[in-house]
Amino acid sequence: MERASLTRSSINPKSNSNLNPDSVEFGYISGYNLRISCQNNISMTAYNLETLDGERYEAQMNLLFLHKLSEKFKNLKAINNIYSYIVKLIKEGNYKIISSPPNIVLVLQITENIENSNEIKIVLSSINRKYGNFKYLQEYLEILTNEIKRIKNSGSIVEKLENENKKLKKEVTDLKNIISSSSNNNLQNSKNNNININKNMIALDEFNKKFGLKIPNNNIKKLDLDNLNLGNEIIDYLAGMNFPFLEKLYIANNDISDIKNIEFFNYNNLQKLSLVDNKISDISALEKCHFADLKELHLYNNNIVNIKPLENSDFSKLQILSLGNNKISTIIFSKFNFVDLKALFLYNNSISDINTLSQCDFKNLEKLALNNNAIEEISVFEKVNFKNLKELWLYNNNISDIDVFSKAKFFNLEVLSLSNNNIENIKTLEKCDFRMLKKLDLGGNKISDITVFAKVNFNDLKELHLFNNNIDNIKILEKTNFDKLEKLVLNDNKIKDINVLSKVNFKNLKILYLYFNKLESIDVLKQTKFPLLEELSIGGNKISNISCLAQTNYINLKSLYLYNNDITDISILSKVNFPHLKILSLRHNKLMNISVLSNTNFTELNNLDLSENKLKEIDIISEVKFPELKELFLYSNSLTDLSVLKKVNFERLNILSLQENKLNNINFLEGVNFPALIKLYLDNNDIEDISALKTAKFPQLEELSLAKNKIMNISVLIRVNFPELKILYLNENKIKDISSLEKVKFDKLQILYLNDNLISNIQVLEKINFLELNELWLYNNNIEDINPLKKFKIGKIQVLSLFGNKIDKEKFANTIKSMQESIKNFQLTEVIY
C-alpha cells in the first residue's frame, strides 16, 4: 500500500514546494497523458479518484481558488468559463514559465480582482498510462496544451510536443506499411484471416515472423489495433482501405478524438466495432456510416456527451450498444430503431432523467445498465415494454422510491441491482411479479424492515444481498419461501441475533455473509441445515466461542472467515469436519496458542491467515499436514524465532508474510527450500543481517520486501540466486553503500526501492545492468552528485524518484536532458523530484 501511495500520487508536494521563478530550464513532458494540478499560496486539497479498475489515485486541485473563480462567473459548474479565462490569460501574454523537472509550471497573472489571489500556478507533469487517466481533467488539458503551442518564446515546450507527435506519426507510418504490405498479390493462399498488431511489431518481417501471416486485404475478417496510441490518423488511414470481408475491428486505446472520416469506412460486413478508451466526444459521423450488419458497437470510456446521432444511424441489426463511462446527461432516442438490441450499457455517466426511454421499443432488450449515474426517479419503467429484460442494473444512483416495480411488467427479470441508493421502504416488493428473479441486490441502502420477504413470491431467488443497511432483526427469514437460495449477504448491519437460521429451509445455501454485525454468539450454527454451505464469513463481530463448529454439518465448507473477533481458543478445530476447507482466516483475534493445528484434517487448505494475533512462537507448524498450502500470513505478531521453517515442507507455498514481528535476523532462511515461493515479506522487523539469503532456495521468488529494518550491508545480494526476482524493497533501512549492486544478478528486476536510506554515492549506477528495470526509487537520501545518471544503462526505466536529496535543480535538469539526448529509446515518463 505504501508503494501505491507513492507511485500514484498526482503531484508530490515536496517536488513543488520551492519553485524558483528565475529557473527557466527545459521542462519535461513525455507520453500522452499529463497530470494537472492547480495550486496557489492559499490552500491545496487532495482528492481521491476511483477508476474503473477499482484502483484509487490522488489528484490535487486548489478547490478554494476554483471556487472563487467560479463565483466570479456566477456558476459553480461553469468550468468551461474557467478554462476560457485561463486561455485568455495565456493569449494576452499574462504568464511566465518556470520549471522543476519534470514539471512545467505556467504562472498566470490574474487580471481581474479575485480576493487575495493574483496568480494561478498550473503544474503539468508526465504520467505513465498504467497509473491512471483522469478523464475529467482532459478537456482542461487539451485546451491548455493547444494554447501553449501558439505561445511565442516557449519553443522548448512546443519542440517537445512536436517530438511526441513525430513518434506517433512514425507508428502510424509503420502501421501503414504493415497493412499495405499484406495486400501483396503473392500472399493469396493463406487461410489466416485475423490480424493483431501491437507496439512490438513495427516491421513487416517481425510481423510475419510472429504470426506467419501472408494475406491480402480482401481476406481479413478481424483487425486488432488496440493499445497503439495511433491517434486520429488511424481513422483517416482506415477510411482509405478496402476490407470487404472484415467482421471485427478493434481500435481501442489509441488516443483518438476525431472520427469524422469513419463514414468512409468501406466495411460492409462489419459486425463488431470497438472504439473504447479513446477521447471521442463527437459521434455525429456515425449517422453516415453504412454498417448494415453491425451487431456490436462499443464506445465506453470516451468523452461523448450527445448520443442523438445514433437515432439516425443505419444500425438496424445492432444487438449490443455500450456507452458507459462517458459524459452523457441526456438519453434522447425518439427515433430509436434498434429493434434487435439486446444489451444497452449507459453506466458511469451523468444521467439524471430517463423518461425518454418511454419513446423506445425495447421488446428484445435483455440487459440494461444504468448504474453509477444521478437517477432519482424511475417511474418510466411502467411505460416501457421490457417483456424480455433479464438484467437491470441501477446501483449507485439516488433512487429512493421503487413503487414502480409493482406496476412494471418484468416477467423475465432475473437480476435486479439497486444497491447503494437511498431506499428505505421495500414493502412494494410484495406486489411485484418477479417470477423469474434469481438475484436481488438491495445492499448499501437505508433499509431496516425486511418483513416484506414473507409475502413475496420469488421462488427462483438464488442471491439476496442486503449488506450495509440498518437491519437489526432477521426473524422474518423463517417465513420466507427461498428454497433455492444459494447466497445470503447480510454483512455490515446491526444484527445481534441469528437464531432464526435454525428454522429456515435454505437447503441450497452455499454462501452466508454475516461479517461486521454485532454477534456475540454463533451457537445456533450447530442447529442449521446447510449441507451445501461452501463459504461462511462471521468476521468483525464480538465472537469469543466457536465450539459450535464441531457440531455443524458443513462438510462442503471451503472458506471460513473468523477474523476480527475476540477468539482466544481454537482447540475445537481438531474436531470439526471440514474436509474440503481451503481458506481459514483467524486474523485479528487474541490467539496465543495454535498447537491444535497439528491435529486438524485440513488436507486441502490453501490459505491460512494467523496475522494480528499474540503469537510468540509457531513451532507446532512443523507438525501440521497442509500439503496444499499456498499462502501463509503471520504478520503483526510477536515472533522472534522462526527456525521451525527449516523443518516444514510447504512445496506449494506462494506467499509468506512475516512483516511487523520482532525478528532481528533471518537465519531461519538458511537452506530453506520453498520451490514455489513467489512473495516473501519481511518488512518492519529489527533485521540487521541478511546473509542467510545466500543459501535460501527460492527459484520462483518475484517479490522480496526487507523494508523498514536496520539493514546496513547489502553486499550479500551478490551471492543471492533469485533468478525470477522482479520487485525488491530495501527502503527505510540504514544503507549507505550500494556499490555491490554492480555485481548483483537480478536479470528480471523491474522495481527497486532504495528510498529513505543514507545513500550519498550513486556511482554504481554507471555499472549496474538491470535491463528490465522500470522504476528506481532513491528519494530521501543524501545524494548530491547525479552525474552517474548520464551513464546509467537505463534499459526500460520509466520512473525515477529523487526528491528529498541535496541535488542542485539546474544540474538535475541538464542531466535529465543529457540522458534523453543520448538514449534513442528513452522511455522515462516520470521523474519525481
Label each residue range with its predicted role:
Residues 775-780, 793-833:
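Leucine-rich repeat domain C-terminal region
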Residues 2-119:
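A structural signal for beta-rich interaction modules in eukaryotic proteins
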Residues 192-258:
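LRR N-terminal entry segment and analogous cap-like coil->beta motifs
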Residues 223-225, 249-251, 271-275, 295-299, ...:
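Conserved hydrophobic beta-strand positions in leucine-rich repeat
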Residues 236-242, 260-267, 284-291, 308-315, ...:
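A structural signal for leucine-rich repeat
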Residues 140, 147-150, 154-157, 164, ...:
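Heptad-repeat coiled-coil/leucine-zipper oligomerization helices
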